[in-house]
């Protein structure tokens, strides 16, 4: 690793979107959906050059004829063949690099099964022949990106949400809490409540339309009951959305009922705590001396933290849970959708990080389990 010219690749494989680019850049070069699509129908026209699988944006644009599968669910890879396709697409089509020439920094959710990162390591070294690799914890990278060394990160993506308290650069594993409630569950919930309005969305392709409605129109209410009354008494909260076939649908209280499930998971029939209680419980698992620093540095990260109003609402809920004199501050960086990637880009370009890489030699010597010793 002596020559400085070799740029490391940073790949943040989210359950919903894959963000990839070069270490040292301030934003990912490629952002595409983590989707592999396979044709639902038999081709009738020869010579069309149809493929048996499409990845990312191409799958998204041909979704009308494909069955779309997400190989990553709740932050855990459930289909390694499809995952390999996504990585192949990332390296060769999106970044246009030879992976055997660049170290690769991957990311994963905390409290993932150990086998998951071992398999990631194995594929990087054996399939893509990378010279070196590293697996970073997503929330820790987000904190790097916000320029802090102490804080609690509430990271919520498409597949998994988690709260990770970090003090002076050390993550506190005993206090990390994971919530398998995230963007994809909200999309499914929105599909369900739109059905109650008489709009049926059922296929995997239609789910993508609902995801778009969610991203464009949903917001978090500061006071849910008040907002429900407001929605019932007037139509000022209603917005219209044009479907791809030109028909227009109207969305009303669904706009805030959908993300409300983050605070009231019982909406989804889930028994877990909302993101505010999870954040609070995570802080309470930490040493009493550092709680004040955590309450004052609650950092939001991930695509599901992008709803307008989520930071004011989280702050309001935290004030009700915390001791009365405690100063609560929720930080919502504007680039939080990509902050995991940005943190990875910062980390991989630090000179002090260069001896942290797992090299091909170390892998050949110790096998995939090396990842637990070198990445924590």
Curated annotation (Swiss-Prot):
SUPFAM superfamilies found in the cross-reference section: Actin-like ATPase domain
Q: What is this enzyme's catalytic activity, as reactions?
A: ATP + H2O = ADP + phosphate + H(+)
Q: What Gene Ontology cellular component terms go with this record?
A: actin cytoskeleton; cytoplasm
Keywords recorded for this protein, A-Z:
ATP-binding, Cytoplasm, Cytoskeleton, Hydrolase, Nucleotide-binding
Q: Name one GO molecular function term.
A: hydrolase activity
Native species = Entamoeba histolytica (strain ATCC 30459 / HM-1:IMSS / ABRM)
Classification via PROSITE patterns: ACTINS_1 (PS00406), ACTINS_2 (PS00432), ACTINS_ACT_LIKE (PS01132)
Q: Where is this region: DNAseI-binding D loop?
A: 40-61
Biological role: Actin is a highly conserved protein that polymerizes to produce filaments that form cross-linked networks in the cytoplasm of cells. Actin exists in both monomeric (G-actin) and polymeric (F-actin) forms, both forms playing key functions, such as cell motility and contraction. Has ATPase activity.
* Name assigned to this protein: Actin
Q: Where in the cell is it found?
A: Cytoplasm, Cytoskeleton
**In the Enzyme Commission scheme, what number(s) does this protein have?**
3.6.4.-
GO terms classed as biological process: phagocytosis
Q: Binding of ATP: at which residues? A: 15-16, 19, 158-160, 214-215, 303
Its main localization is: cytoplasm
The record's similarity note reads: Belongs to the actin family.
What Pfam families does the entry give? Actin
């Amino acid at each position: 690793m002596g020559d400085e010219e070799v740029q490391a690749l940073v790949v943040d494989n989210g359950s919903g979107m894959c963000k990839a680019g070069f270490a040292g850049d301030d934003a990912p070069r490629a952002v595409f959906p983590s989707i592999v699509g396979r044709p639902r129908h038999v081709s009738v026209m020869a010579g069309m050059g149809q493929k048996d699988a499409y990845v990312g944006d191409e799958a998204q644009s041909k979704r009308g004829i494909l069955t779309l599968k997400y190989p990553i669910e709740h932050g855990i890879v459930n289909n390694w063949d499809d995952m390999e396709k996504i990585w192949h697409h990332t390296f060769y089509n999106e970044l246009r690099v030879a992976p055997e020439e660049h170290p690769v920094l991957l990311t994963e959710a905390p409290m993932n099964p150990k086998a998951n990162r071992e398999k990631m390591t194995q594929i990087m070294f054996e399939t893509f022949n990378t010279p070196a690799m590293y697996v970073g914890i997503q929330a820790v990278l987000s904190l790097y990106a916000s320029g802090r060394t102490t804080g609690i990160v509430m990271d919520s993506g498409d597949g998994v949400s988690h709260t990770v308290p970090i003090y002076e650069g050390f993550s506190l594993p005993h206090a990390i809490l994971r919530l398998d409630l995230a963007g994809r569950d909200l999309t499914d919930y929105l599909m369900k409540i739109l059905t109650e309005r008489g709009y049926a969305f059922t296929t995997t392709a239609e789910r993508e339309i609902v995801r778009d409605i969610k991203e464009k129109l949903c917001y978090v209410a500061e006071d849910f009951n008040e907002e429900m009354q407001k929605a019932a008494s007037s139509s000022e909260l209603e917005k219209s959305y044009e479907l791809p076939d030109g028909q227009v649908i109207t969305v009303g209280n669904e706009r805030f009922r959908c993300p409300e499930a983050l605070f009231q998971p019982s909406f989804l029939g889930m028994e877990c705590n909302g993101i505010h209680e999870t954040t609070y419980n995570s802080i309470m698992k930490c040493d009493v001396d550092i709680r004040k620093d955590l309450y004052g540095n609650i950092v939001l990260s991930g695509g599901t933290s992008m709803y307008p109003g989520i930071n004011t609402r989280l702050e309001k809920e935290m004030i009700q849970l915390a001791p009365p004199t405690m100063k609560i501050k929720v930080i919502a960086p504007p680039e939080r959708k990509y902050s995991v990637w940005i943190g990875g880009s910062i980390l991989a370009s630090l000179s002090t990080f260069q001896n942290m890489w797992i090299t091909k030699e170390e892998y050949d010597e110790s096998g995939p389990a090396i990842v637990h010793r070198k990445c924590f």
